[in-house]
Amino acid sequence: MGDAGLIVIGGATATGKTALAIALAQQLNSVILSADSRQVYRGFDIGTAKPTPAQQQQVRHHLIDICDPRETLTLAIYQAKAQALIAHYHAQGITPLLVGGTGLYIRSITQGLTMPQVPPQPHLRAQLMALGQQECYQWLQQVDPVAAQRIHAHDQVRTLRALEVYYTTGVPLSQQQRREPPPYRIWYFALTGGDRQQERCRIEARTQEMLAMGWLDEIQQLQRQYGEDLPLLDTLGYREMRQYLRGEVTLAEAIALTVQHTQQFAKRQRTWFRAEPDIHWLQATTLEAQLAEIQAQFTLCPKTTATKRRMS
């Protein structure tokens, strides 16, 4: 592969990114940098599909379990940590893998987004949280409509952060982001995940697997440890399963809601990744074929990023 660069594996949830990344990292004797905005938080393991301890023993993982759930990991902090790790491995001649479905995390590295250096404001955040997510999002639509278009109405963490930046600096977050592309080579791959029925089956199977692994116990432990008002407990999957634990829906209904909302989230992820430049969409459906397709791109594109291919 020549000089050290960066391999990115993105795509929607439940498309097999983790398995592919581990196999590729083993082939290349490399490491994995997680690009998942929930896997950074300790204790949120099963419901975020965090690589298991066994998987983490196979290949060294970074940017997992680096933050207390009561704290806020800003994009600027994530970016700084990721860039430092990339530089560390480049100095050893290693090309690391950046893997995940949080498109903004990936973009902050591949396009070099420069983020405002605004530390968390606990008192302001507490005041905003008291208003509730619906009112906060309405405020965001007024003060920073560009950011509001990028942030889902139920994404409390990013909504609060955007408002925090605005009320601290007086300048909308969307106006403070600049781009400084990195100097190293990037290979950017994404997984398609097949058709919608295949996607639904995978998501449902993964949800059942999470439950079998003890997801409900994890949620109850998190509630006991951090309280039921923890914003992360109101994120995808955790929110629906807590409805079941409160007796508001049956388990079957909670599973159906989780699958439905996860598919909706996956659609938004695909929309994001389709808009990213220089992505090679992997057409292969088996792990072995995907690895071969990636290796072929190293041969075909030795000096540039991979050619973009949109999903059909």
UniProtKB/Swiss-Prot annotation:
Enzyme class: transferase
Site (Interaction with substrate tRNA): 102
Any matching Pfam family: IPPT
Cofactor entry: Mg(2+)
Gene Ontology molecular function: ATP binding; tRNA dimethylallyltransferase activity
Sequence segments annotated as region (Interaction with substrate tRNA): 36-39
Family stated for the protein in its record: Belongs to the IPP transferase family.
UniProt function note: Catalyzes the transfer of a dimethylallyl group onto the adenine at position 37 in tRNAs that read codons beginning with uridine, leading to the formation of N6-(dimethylallyl)adenosine (i(6)A).
Name of protein: tRNA dimethylallyltransferase
Gene name for this UniProt entry: miaA
